[in-house]
């Protein structure tokens, strides 16, 4: 097999980058549709008289924020020169674990472990935002 020239490698990288960008754009549009559906679901849960609907409302709010954070991550990717900032993934991780605590809080040990994971992610976020590691 012959080695590829530098211009061909750059062409391949450009094609793959464009496929990635198109995929992320499509994912962003799908997430916007899901965000709209979640808005309708939240409105239904808000005006439902049952007590169980209040738990659905809280769970739906956290899911809403997850959609919102993923859309913000995609927007940030395109605005920052095709780069995913690490701290946005940490924000999404924290929100996902909070949702897990709200939805699945069966044993105190699980809640304690989830809380420790959140603490670890907050420490990671603090380190990422410190002057030594800050890129922006």
Swiss-Prot record:
Residues 36-54, 104-107 are periplasmic. Keywords: Cell inner membrane, Cell membrane, Membrane, Transmembrane, Transmembrane helix. It is found in: Cell inner membrane. GO terms for cellular component: plasma membrane. The keyword Mitochondrion does not apply. This is Protein PsiE. Signal peptide: none annotated. Belongs to the PsiE family. The chain crosses the membrane at residues 15-35, 55-75, 83-103, 108-128. Induction: Expression is under the control of the two-component regulatory system PhoQ/PhoP. Residues 1-14, 76-82, 129-136 are cytoplasmic. The gene is psiE. GO terms for biological process: cellular response to phosphate starvation. NCBIfam families: PRK02833.1-2, PRK02833.1-3, PRK02833.1-5. PANTHER family: PROTEIN PSIE. It is a multi-pass membrane protein. Its main location: membrane. It comes from Salmonella typhimurium (strain LT2 / SGSC1412 / ATCC 700720). It comes from the Bacteria.
């Amino acid at each position: 097999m012959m080695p590829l020239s530098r211009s061909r490698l750059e062409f391949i990288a450009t094609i793959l980058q464009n496929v990635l960008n198109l995929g992320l754009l499509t994912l962003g549009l799908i997430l916007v549709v899901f965000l709209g559906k979640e808005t309708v679901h939240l409105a239904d849960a808000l005006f439902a008289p049952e007590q169980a609907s209040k738990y659905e409302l809280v769970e739906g709010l956290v899911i809403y924020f997850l959609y919102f954070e993923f859309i913000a991550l995609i927007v940030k990717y395109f605005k920052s020169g095709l780069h995913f900032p690490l701290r946005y993934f940490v924000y999404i991780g924290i929100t996902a674990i909070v949702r897990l605590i709200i939805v699945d809080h069966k044993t105190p040990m699980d809640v304690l472990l989830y809380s420790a994971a959140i603490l670890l992610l907050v420490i990671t976020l603090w380190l990422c935002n410190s002057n030594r590691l800050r890129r922006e």
